[in-house]
From Swiss-Prot:
EC number assigned by the record: 2.7.4.25
Locations listed in the record: Cytoplasm
GO molecular function, one term: dCMP kinase activity
HAMAP family per UniProt: Cytidyl_kinase_type1 (MF_00238)
Protein name: Cytidylate kinase
GO terms (BP aspect): pyrimidine nucleotide metabolic process
Kinase in keyword set: yes
A Pfam family recorded for this sequence: Cytidylate_kin
SUPFAM superfamilies: P-loop containing nucleoside triphosphate hydrolases (SSF52540)
Main location: cytoplasm
Keyword Isomerase: no
Record's keyword terms, sorted: ATP-binding, Cytoplasm, Kinase, Nucleotide-binding, Transferase
Lineage: Bacteria, Bacillati, Mycoplasmatota, Mollicutes, Mycoplasmataceae
Length: 222
């Protein structure tokens, strides 16, 4: 059976990464969190000690930037940077980089090139609408915002991250949704041919099962 190209968009903290990493393992597909590509490039820019406000210097670094993903590990120019991509330094700098059209175009083309051999699941905010509009399967994952905030808060407590209250997380998600859905370049949208999944009252494994079954069904029709 021929494998598929699967595009996934969805709201922040709706479980996209944890769910579709599991789906990818079961199906023996390659999982790509496209947001990590932007984080990896941001790390690369910071590692070169350039002026992060100088767009020309940032754009020039694209010529020497090499990104690879293997077994959930992220490599930049053969350096494993997986554990360096969640630093506050990167999170503070990334918005100055993602707004640059040339960076955006580079990433979209790289992501499109990546899936030419099929057997890929790409997750992001505008994958179904911009990056892979012709994907074999498009999915929009959503969840009630209060439930998203509750899950994130409980996850933080479990990991002993106590810097934000439930209310703060809830307010952050409201702002994040607004930013994602109204950004000028690549806003989060529900495209007409996407399969809408609301996982507010489903477990991770329940969503994984229905997606895997759907993929098997589509593969058998190829």
């Amino acid at each position: 059976m021929e494998k598929l190209i699967i595009a996934v968009d969805g709201t922040s903290s709706s479980g996209k990464s944890v769910i579709f990493k599991k789906v990818a393992r079961i199906l023996n597909y390659q999982f790509v969190d496209t947001g990590l590509m932007y984080r990896a490039f941001t790390w690369y820019c910071l590692s070169k000690n350039i002026d992060i406000n100088n767009q020309n210097q940032i754009i020039k670094l694209l010529d020497s930037f090499d990104y690879k993903i293997s077994n959930d590990q992220v490599f930049v120019n053969n350096t494993n940077v997986t554990n360096k991509l969640t630093s506050s330094e990167i999170l503070n700098a990334i918005n100055k980089i993602t707004i640059i059209p040339q960076i955006r175009n580079y990433m979209v083309k790289a992501q499109q090139q990546m899936v030419k051999n099929k057997g890929y699941i790409l997750v992001g905010r505008d994958i179904t609408s911009v990056v892979l509009p012709n994907a074999d399967l498009k999915i929009y994952l959503d969840c009630d915002i209060e439930i998203r905030a509750k899950r994130r808060f409980e996850q933080n407590v479990e990991n002993k991250i106590l810097d934000k209250s439930f209310k703060q997380i809830y307010q952050d998600l409201i702002k994040r949704d607004q930013v994602d859905k109204t950004r000028k370049i690549g806003p989060l949208v529900l495209v007409s041919d996407a399969w809408y999944i609301d996982n507010s009252y489903l477990t991770i494994d329940q969503v994984v099962d229905i997606v895997v079954n759907k993929v098997h069904q589509l593969e058998s029709q190829k």
